Amino acid sequence: MAIPVESFFLAPGGQGSLQHRLRQMVTEGILSGRFRPGDRMPSTRALAAHLGVARITVTLAYADLVASDYLLARGRSGTFVSAAAPDARKARPLPRDGARTDWARLLHPRAQGLPRPDRPRDWSLYRYPFIYGQADPELFDHQNWRACALQALGRREFHRLSADCYDEDDPLLVEYILRHILPRRGIAAVPSEVLITMGAQNGLWLAAQVLLGPGERAAMENPGYPGTRAVLGTTGAEVLSVDVDDRGLVPAQLPARLKLVVTTASHHCPTNATLPVERRLALLAAAEAGDFLILEDDYEFEMSFLQSAAPSLKSLDAGGRVVHVGSFSKSLFPGLRLGYLVAPAPFVAAVRALRATVLRHPPGQLQRTLALFLSLGHYDALVARMKAAYRLRREVMTKAIEDNGLQIAGQGGFGGSSFWMQAPGAVDTEDLALRLRAEGVLIEPGRVFFDPARERRNFYRLAYSSIGPAAIPEGIARIARALR
């Protein structure tokens, strides 16, 4: 790749001759890894004109660097970074001015210590990846997605993509959500009550930012989705944990003086429990009596292959106190980063203004591609294929778990893509996960799902969204052997 001439500049007041400073600039670029073997250097004429120096200065500097094996001259083809140049990975790190900056003091405490997923970046190379939230590329409809993406880039659609829509969403995508997605959750809404988000995590963040601040109180499930705890923590509000049982959140245990309750009512994360109707009604009644709002993270309802998914909490919301957050990441692919938020129009207007301040709107090309994929029926066909695959994988995993004597702590009744598991009390599943990586097995330790003040270390999650049925039995057997 060609190195842009703009990559080079001479700092005012530099020490040494122009030729020396130019050599130093190139060697620092190579040693830092910015310039890589095979990259083509700017021509001597172009670099001299850019820096405002004589061409002979650049020519002599290049000649010295060729003699030192930093650069390689290839005649009329140009000058390139040499493969014999020192390896940037082995070179001593160059001193940076930022090292003198006290970032621990300058960064706000809320920006420090935010959780990061504890999984290797190369997870797909492991033979037994029982990790949640990753897609199996073998199931995805690449051909039709590509066709929809090309159509979205066509002349007929491009006029919208090329405009700055400021805070507006793709009307075709909003219409499909209103007419096809929300009715499946028992929700009736109008366009002013829907906002497109950059995935469920972004929806949770937007909602929390417009609702909470220092001195206010929010409650979430324990165990619960780690991303919720991180989002609530960024607001400065007091975050309280409410223990769940085998049926989910217990409304009677909610603390007083709340501003917000976050729940995964239809499919609790991570236990997979579904909140019964009587508890849903009790939660809504508590919201009315206590004057708080409910943030419903309604994930993975599409994967209901054992029985129909329970209606959303929002479908029972007569008082307008539920903010409903949904996502397409689990049913399409996590890298899509598109979802939606449904709430009363005044709330959506406030969130839309915040979103516009941060990122205007999600990419128009992605929105239109998804809208076409949905409206042409490809999405429903994909979901049907995934449900069939997940049903088979769940059956295989259930048998493997039983055959190996592992203990299921939560599996849900409608489907999903994971099991919540419990190891013997003395087992630390973070240590277990490290040992299993050497065996080619990836699991999710359960500690991160719990309130840090009441953490449990002997739980873990096993997902089957990214592992084929043929690999499941051996992967489960390796987990069982590691637990013995």
UniProtKB/Swiss-Prot annotation:
Domain HTH gntR-type: start-end pairs: 16-84
Expression induction: Induced by taurine. Positively autoregulated.
Coiled-coil intervals: none
GO molecular function: DNA binding; DNA-binding transcription factor activity; pyridoxal phosphate binding; transaminase activity
Domain of life: Bacteria
Needed cofactors: pyridoxal 5'-phosphate
DNA-binding region ranges: 44-63
InterPro entries: Aminotransferase_I/II_large, HTH_trans_reg/aminotransferase, PyrdxlP-dep_Trfase, PyrdxlP-dep_Trfase_major, Tscrpt_reg_HTH_GntR, WH-like_DNA-bd_sf, WH_DNA-bd_sf
GO terms under biological process: biosynthetic process
Gene3D superfamilies noted in UniProt: Type I PLP-dependent aspartate aminotransferase-like (Major domain), Winged helix-like DNA-binding domain superfamily/Winged helix DNA-binding domain
CDD domains: AAT_like, WHTH_GntR
Keywords associated with the record: Activator, Aminotransferase, DNA-binding, Pyridoxal phosphate, Transcription, Transcription regulation, Transferase
Further remarks about this protein from its record: In vitro, taurine does not influence the binding of TauR to the tpa promoter.
Family statement drawn from the similarity comment of this UniProt entry: In the C-terminal section; belongs to the class-I pyridoxal-phosphate-dependent aminotransferase family.
Protein function: Transcriptional activator, which is essential for taurine-dependent expression of the tpa-tauR-xsc operon. Acts by binding to direct repeats in the promoter region.
PANTHER family per the UniProt record, alphabetical: HTH-TYPE TRANSCRIPTIONAL REGULATORY PROTEIN GABR (PTHR46577:SF1)
Protein name: HTH-type transcriptional regulator TauR
Organism name: Rhodobacter capsulatus (strain ATCC BAA-309 / NBRC 16581 / SB1003)
Lineage, top ranks: Bacteria, Pseudomonadati, Pseudomonadota, Alphaproteobacteria, Rhodobacterales
Name of the coding gene: tauR
